[in-house]
Amino acid sequence: MSFGKLYTYPKAPRSTMVLFVAKYNKLDVEICNAFPIKVYPEKGGVGEEYLSKFHTGKVPALETADGFTVYESNAVAWFLAKQDPNTKLCGSGLKEETTVLRWASFTNYELLPPIMAWIRPIIGRAPSSPEILKTCEEACELTIRAIEKEITGKNYLVGDTLTLADLFVVSGLARGYQYVFTKSWAEKHPVVHEYYMRVRNDKDGIFDSILGSNIIRDEPGGTYPDYDGL
């Protein structure tokens, strides 16, 4: 029996970690396309039926077989992780659980926004100039340094095993690697790059099954048809 329906669109960055958890816990989840009008205006939005269940019209969103609905990536990922009563993805004990939630919020509010602000001029979705691109890159640097300080000398962000903290942060970093985190960028950030590659390549290739092969660009790039929005 299907666990439920997970609504998203291809390569949506805030859905990556949710899809990972579903696969990791071997949940029988039906993936349903939903295209928010903010991201794909040409598709006309998600429709009234969707909005009646998920009032903000955002993805990811989950509807379980018994009719329970939840949206916002932090909540959906947490709910799916907890389907395994012995899960370690949420951390062990209150302090670790709190730290995991902090990293989830950090990804959505501190990591993804500056990455997306850097990507938009690159792909022609915002004005671009050398000064604009430099400012965008510098804004990303502040966030990357914060990750670097936390992960130095450790394999995982929280505790000694993989948690949602790692899944959120690596999912956010993956967006950067798709467009602006080039080989030269990786050379300048060896600690974060090594951490990203280690987690990205862990757990039976689950990330690759969601995002495709991990290719690092020689130069920043990407075009609108490849752009998957926020």
Regions flagged by a language model, labelled:
Residues 1-134:
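GST-like domain detector, emphasizing the conserved glutathione-binding G-site
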Residues 9, 164, 214:
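Short, solvent-exposed turn/loop segments enriched in Gly/Ser/Thr/Pro and often Arg
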Residues 16-19, 198, 202:
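Short, cationic motifs built from Arg/Lys/His that form the positively charged side of catalytic pockets
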Residues 27, 55, 85, 152, ...:
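Proline-centered flexible-loop/turn and helix-kink motifs
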Residues 81, 172-173, 210:
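Active-site-flanking alpha-helical
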Residues 95, 103-201:
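GST-like fold's C-terminal all-alpha helical module
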Residues 204-207, 212-214:
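Exported/periplasmic ABC-transporter solute-binding proteins
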Residues 213-230:
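Acidic/histidine-enriched, glycine/proline-rich intrinsically disordered or flexible terminal extensions
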